[in-house]
């Protein structure tokens, strides 16, 4: 039980560090690589890595094969969560073309607030203590990410990144709904397979690879 609690703290912390540090790289590439191209190129290696990891875990921890209904559930979960994730990262990358990494980091992290707000419409109860922590987190993110110059005005890029936060919130709610029904690693793999499947069509139409290179 103790190891489980430590894992619940350490793994999200590592994820937050990786996710937060990526904003600078995304911002630098935003003026050179289109949002769909960027999404495709970051999702393909992630999908391949997760697929290999799933294969290794299945070999190390054999289990019964999925039933037809479980396969449908995994497919449905991957499509729903993957579509939301595709839209979220596309809006985020598009917004970074016209806003700073600091503002994008703050606005994207507003999904922390939106998850419990939207969750109430799906029957999720939220305690007052959680709302207090959310308020403190948002205030901290604001002072960390937004300085006086960045805080002036609300640009088209800011709106795009806010839509990203909304989509991230729904994606997290969807993952929470399905994660108890399917394997979490397989769901992650399915999501990252969906991203290039959707993004490459728009990339080929609006952002041909020759213009990226």
Task: Please provide the spans of the model-predicted regions.
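Hydrophobic/aromatic residues within transmembrane alpha-helices
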Residues: 29, 38, 42, 95, ...
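Hydrophobic transmembrane alpha-helices of multi-pass small-molecule transport proteins
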Residues: 50, 126-147, 165-168, 199
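C-terminal transmembrane-helix exit sites in multi-pass transporters
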Residues: 49-54, 111-132
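Specific transmembrane alpha-helical segments of multi-pass solute transporters/efflux pumps
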Residues: 22, 55-108, 143, 211-213
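Structural signature of hydrophobic alpha-helical transmembrane segments
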Residues: 34-48, 93-111, 154-167, 213
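Glycine-/small-residue-enriched transmembrane alpha-helix faces in small-molecule transporters
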Residues: 1-37, 83, 91, 150-177, ...
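Small-residue-rich packing faces within the transmembrane alpha-helices of Major Facilitator Superfamily
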Residues: 20, 44-48, 138, 169, ...
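Cytoplasmic-side transmembrane-helix entry/capping segments in multi-pass membrane proteins
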Residues: 73-80, 126-138, 157-161, 182-192
């Amino acid at each position: 039980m103790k190891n489980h609690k430590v894992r619940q703290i350490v793994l999200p912390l590592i994820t937050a560090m990786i996710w937060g540090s990526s904003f600078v790289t995304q911002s630098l590439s935003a003026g050179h690589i289109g949002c769909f191209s960027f999404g495709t190129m970051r999702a393909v290696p992630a999908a391949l890595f997760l697929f290999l990891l799933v294969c290794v875990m299945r070999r190390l921890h054999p289990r019964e094969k999925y039933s037809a209904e479980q396969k449908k559930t995994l497919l449905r979960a991957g499509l729903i969560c993957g579509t939301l994730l595709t839209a979220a990262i596309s809006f985020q990358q598009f917004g970074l073309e016209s806003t700073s990494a600091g503002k994008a980091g703050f606005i994207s992290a507003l999904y922390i607030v939106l998850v419990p707000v939207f969750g109430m419409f799906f029957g999720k109860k939220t305690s007052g203590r959680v709302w207090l922590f959310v308020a403190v987190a948002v205030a901290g993110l604001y002072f960390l990410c937004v300085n006086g110059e960045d805080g002036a005005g609300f640009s088209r890029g800011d709106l795009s990144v806010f839509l990203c936060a909304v989509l991230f919130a729904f994606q997290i709610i969807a993952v929470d709904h399905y994660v108890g029904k399917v394997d979490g690693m397989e769901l992650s793999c399915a999501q990252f397979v969906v991203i290039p499947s959707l993004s490459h069509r728009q990339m080929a139409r609006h952002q041909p690879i020759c213009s990226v290179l």
